[in-house]
Structures are given as C-alpha cells and as structure tokens.
Regions:
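Tryptophan-anchored aromatic micro-motifs
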Residues: 2-27, 96, 126-138
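Short, compact, well-ordered microdomains
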Residues: 77-116
Length: 142
C-alpha cells in the first residue's frame, strides 16, 4: 500500500458497533487521508465523534496497512485514540479505537467529497462535533 492509494475521501458504510443512523447523524460518516508536506495525515467523523489523524504506513507479514493515532472530540468531550485500516478488494476496512472507550470495525468506500470541507486542522476544544461542523460550513473557501 502506498500513500497515493489512500489519499482521498472514504465514505464509512458500515461499523460493527454503530448503525447507519448514528454514523451519518451530523454529516455523512467519513475518513479522509491527505499529504501535509511529506507526512500522511487525515480526519474522520461519524456521529458526534470527530478526529484528526497522524498516520504511518506499515507492513506486517507481507500485508501493508495504515495505522494512526487521533485526537479530537467524542460528543462534546475531548477524545483520542488509535486505529488501523487496509485495502481489501477496493474497500477500506479497519478498526477504530476510542481511548478508554468503545472500539469498532468499519468499512468505507472511496467517494468524491460532498460539498466544501475546510480541511485545515484547528482546535475545537470544548466545542461539540455538531458545532464544529457548523463552524466549518461558515468558513469561507481557501
């Protein structure tokens, strides 16, 4: 797996722990990867969980995958955790962990990003995921 194979927007279609209603509660659930300078970064949101990813490509027993740590919001509380994913027959499959909380397998499919999304990293400490989304929607395009 290369960085290029991951770059882009992936729509979360299924999670082991949460149903489609929760996944798409605030925005359509997604995970997105991009290069910042020479580093693979990303972001995700499902339900009221939103996070920014610091990613690394790894290889174990001949299988390539991406792993990450994340920080962000879990409902209106600070959140953090880790996760991993691999490509499987055109899908992104993996597992997301919330530190000292739930973890869930997920599946995602590549899609075009719906509408404009401000991809600049910003602190949202003390702001709920829905408030953060409204704030991003009001940000003028860069």
């Amino acid at each position: 797996m290369t960085n290029a194979a991951l770059i882009g927007y992936w729509k979360i279609t299924k999670m082991e722990v949460w149903d489609a209603g929760y996944i798409d509660l605030v925005v359509p659930g997604f995970i997105e990867f991009e290069m910042e300078d020479d580093h693979l970064m990303g972001q995700f949101q499902f339900g009221t969980v939103i996070g920014w990813l610091d990613c690394r490509i790894r290889n174990m027993s001949g299988q390539s995958y991406v792993e990450w740590s994340w920080e962000g919001q879990n409902d209106s509380d600070p959140g953090c955790g880790r996760g991993w994913a691999r490509l499987d027959d055109g899908k992104l499959v993996g597992r997301l962990f919330i530190h000292c909380g739930d973890d869930s397998a997920f599946e995602a499919v590549r899609q075009n990003r719906p509408g404009h999304r401000d991809r600049r990293r910003r602190s949202i400490k003390g702001v709920s995921a829905s408030q953060a989304q409204v704030s991003r929607e009001r940000t003028p395009p860069v």
